[in-house]
Amino acid sequence: MEADLVVGAVLVPGAKAPKLVTNALVAKMKPGSVLVDVAIDQGGCFEDSHATTHADPTFKVHESLFYCVANMPGAVPATSTYALANATIGYALAIANKGWEKAIGEDPSLGYGLNVHDGQIRYAAVAKAHNL
C-alpha cells in the first residue's frame, strides 16, 4: 500500500459508520502511514479505531499511526463555533421567528433535523441505531 495518509470521513446519517479499513489492510500499509478517522464520533470507519483525546491523540497499529480524536473541532473551539453558527443561524432564526411547524412547512429541509416530537423518535435511522 502506497498511501502516506488515509482520511476516513464516512457518515451514514443517524447510524454507526461502517468499518471500511480492516486490520489486515493496515498491516499491508507502509511504515509511518497515518490514518485519521473523522468518523470516530459515529464509531469509526477503521476496524482498529477507538476514540482518543486531544491530550493523547494517537496510537500505533502495526507500523501505522492512528488519529481518532472525538470531537475534532474541539481543537479549535472559537473557529469551529463561528463556522457552526454561520452554517445554522438561518435555520435557528426561521424557527425562532415562525415557530417550528411553520418553518418546516416553508422549508421542508428543516424537517430532516426533527428527531423527536411529542415523545416519539421521528427519525427512523436514530430509532434503529438505538433499537427503539
Where are these predicted regions, by residue range?
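Rossmann-like adenosine-cofactor binding region
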Residues: M1-E63
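Adenosine-phosphate binding glycine-rich loop
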Residues: I40, C45-L132
